[in-house]
Curated annotation (Swiss-Prot):
Per UniProt, location of the Glycyl lysine isopeptide (Lys-Gly) (interchain with G-Cter in SUMO) cross-link in this chain: K240
Gene that this polypeptide is encoded by: Rora
Organism: Mus musculus
Modified sites of kind N6-methyllysine: K38
NR C4-type zinc finger span: 73-93, 109-133
GO cellular component: nucleolus; nucleoplasm; nucleus
Name of this protein: Nuclear receptor ROR-alpha
């Protein structure tokens, strides 16, 4: 484990915002300097407008914030809100820098002082985030300089024009006569399809395919997940092999196994189990969209009746697309989680893709229990806690009821983060998936994960039978994902062009049947 990492900045990571810490109504004119005294409202980022003028930029007092917001935050790449402390930044990085200066804080880096700072990772290392703020020129003294010089205005004008031209070029790629797309728009190949193997392999390498990036006005919907410098995890091969524990089914420690190959029953050291559990728990915490504590603090923020009616009045295809985007965001975090699990990247590429294709949504549903409030039957969605009524316009109330029932059931088990992490990894490494090439290798890995899960459950003094209950959830998860596929296919039959043109590519690759041939393996 790392030594003395800085504690996360609780005010710098509000869930549910594309620019996670944006403040509603706290915008400055873009060419004035920020004094850093304005308050920030949590979760306001998702309500920001992404509208931008198509007219030229006039660098005057009348310049609207939306014109400068076309330039992303210089620190994390999120949607900017103006010039703060001399640099174009988002509200979150502005607030983080202000707090760091007010408290004269000293941060430490748990890694090698070269952490990637982007929209998804900015809250993981305060030291590297502050160093990047300083490197790009943020300064408390910047507020003293007043308005920009002509040279600075000209430079800003040129940069805005460059970003606007890039956006217009992307807009012009739309075919003449094509129906106006729902936002966000994703570019696709000429035949409307992409190869699952090639494109998901790109996600496995830690990069978003160029052809699938949304334009800058909506890029916050589609996340670029990149590996951290220490994603290799713990070196299990270096662990000394004592004490040895025989955790075979006959030993009594492993009473709930349903593995088919008895020869794969593992003999592992207690140290190896501890390290595997630590690796998976760490990977889980580093790849969760939101901190659990933050989610629990805002359970009272439910949608008002007027807001619920707004969702209910959305066109069916619009609501489907919104949910597809949200699911895709969550799945990209699951992909990163899988990559960090010891042993996963040693699997052949075919098996990595098969496991993710089959299990990523199941892990999303497991993680949903972190964002579920069983007291009022709501789940965190699009910035607030939503009841089943919010999803009425999808036209699949039975499926939504199934989702909420599962969320409530799993939530009632009061799983810790370690237990959620290990159960997620166990589900992801299912050796009974179709088209796997190295089933025995995956079965051994899954057995070790289940041993680690049982070890953690016993350490936590959980009641007898909880592992059995968890394993029984696997069949429910598969039924839930099967129902999702049924509903998607029914929707696709009515709106094929919406799915083909406007759903996120990764979502289509994972869930639409047209990609199944890519998974067929000779022999």
């Amino acid at each position: 484990m790392e030594s003395a990492p800085a504690a996360p900045d609780p005010a710098a990571s509000e869930p549910g915002s594309s620019g996670s810490e944006a403040a509603a109504g706290s915008r400055e004119t873009p060419l004035t300097q920020d004094t850093g005294r304005k308050s920030e409202a949590p979760g306001a980022g998702r309500r920001q407008s992404y509208a931008s003028s198509s007219r030229g930029i006039s660098v005057t007092k009348k310049t609207h914030t939306s014109q400068i917001e076309i330039i992303p935050c210089k620190i994390c790449g999120d949607k900017s809100s103006g010039i703060h402390y001399g640099v174009i930044t988002c509200e979150g990085c502005k607030g983080f820098f202000r707090r760091s200066q007010q408290s004269n804080a000293t941060y430490s880096c748990p890694r090698q002082k070269n952490c990637l700072i982007d929209r998804t990772s900015r809250n993981r290392c305060q030291h590297c985030r502050l160093q990047k703020c300083l490197a790009v020129g943020m300064s408390r003294d910047a507020v003293k300089f007043g308005r920009m010089s002509k040279k600075q205005r000209d430079s800003l004008y040129a940069e805005v024009q460059k970003h606007r031209m890039q956006q217009q070029q992307r807009d012009h790629q739309q075919q003449p006569g094509e129906a106006e797309p729902l936002t966000p728009t994703y570019n696709i190949s000429a035949n409307g399809l992409t190869e699952l193997h090639d494109d998901l392999s790109t996600y496995m390498d830690g990069h978003t395919p160029e052809g699938s990036k949304a334009d800058s006005a909506v890029s916050s919907f589609y996340l670029d997940i990149q590996p951290s410098p220490d994603q290799s995890g713990l070196d299990i091969n270096g662990i000394k092999p004592e004490p040895i524990c025989d955790y075979t089914p006959a030993s009594g420690f492993f009473p709930y196994c349903s593995f088919t190959n008895g020869e794969t029953s593992p003999t592992v050291s207690m140290a190896e189990l501890e390290h595997l559990a630590q690796n998976i728990s760490k990977s889980h915490l580093e790849t969760c969209q939101y901190l659990r504590e933050e989610l629990q603090q805002i359970t009272w923020q439910t949608f008002l009746q007027e807001e619920i009616e707004n969702y209910q009045n959305k066109q069916r295809e619009v609501m489907w697309q919104l949910c597809a985007i949200k699911i895709t965001e969550a799945i990209q975090y699951v992909v990163e989680f899988a990559k960090r699990i010891d042993g996963f990247m040693e699997l052949c590429q075919n098996d990595q893709i098969v496991l993710l294709k089959a299990g990523s949504l199941e892990v999303v549903f497991i993680r949903m229990c972190r964002a579920f409030d069983s007291q009022n039957n709501t789940v965190y969605f699009d910035g607030k806690y939503a009841s089943p009524d919010v999803f009425k316009s999808l036209g699949c109330e039975d499926f939504i009821s199934f989702v909420f029932e599962f969320g409530k059931s799993l939530c009632s088990m009061h799983l810790t983060e370690d237990e959620i992490a290990l159960f997620s990894a166990f589900v992801l490494m299912s050796a009974d998936r179709s088209w796997l090439q190295e089933k025995v290798k995956i079965e051994k890995l899954q057995q070790k994960i289940q041993l680690a899960l049982q070890h953690v459950l016993q350490k936590n003094h959980r009641e007898d039978g909880i592992l059995t209950k968890l394993i029984c959830k696997v069949s429910t998860l598969r039924a839930l994902c099967g129902r999702h596929t049924e509903k998607l296919m029914a929707f696709k039959a009515i709106y094929p062009d919406i799915v083909r043109l406007h759903f996120p590519p990764l979502y289509k690759e994972l869930f639409t049947s047209e990609f199944e041939p890519a998974m067929q393996i000779d022999g």
